[in-house]
Amino acid sequence: IRDRANPFLGYRAVRIYEEYASLFTTQLRSILRASAHGSLKIMIPMISSMEEILWVKEKLAEAKQQLRNEHIPFDEKIQLGIMLEVPSVMFIIDQCCEEIDFFSIGSNDLTQYLLAVDRDNAKVTRHYNSLNPAFLRALDYAVQAVHSQGKWIGLCGELGAKGSVLPLLVGLGPVSYTHL
């Protein structure tokens, strides 16, 4: 993949999987094979549409069938999750809950994309604020929507590491926090 002006947007994560479908299938098969030896989950980054979710699920089903045909053991109930980091997916969480087992909010990327702030551009970094009311509403909406469907949701990124924000995060309800 060639260098791009803004590598955080555009062609990365789930968006490259189709071009590299055979590599993606190999990775899925490897994860599935490893799942026979311990508890594993699969989480897909940069999801922005149901079409991407359904494509990933199709590839996962194909990889599972290949392993069944080869009599290779794996966890049939391996969970599939997505990162909530592209704002468009926030508006289809209800549909995502029908197809996905768990969610993780990528606070760094979601803040950047929701507020249209390039974290690496010194002229606009002052606008990068995970405590912006719009971001907090999005966070609350995601947690409530996912919980209403009985699904697990976590939070990763810098926001989860800020001790001063912990009371606010606890107020959202049961969410796991990870600093990445």
Residue spans of the language-model regions?
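Conserved alpha/beta-domain cores
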Residues: 1-180
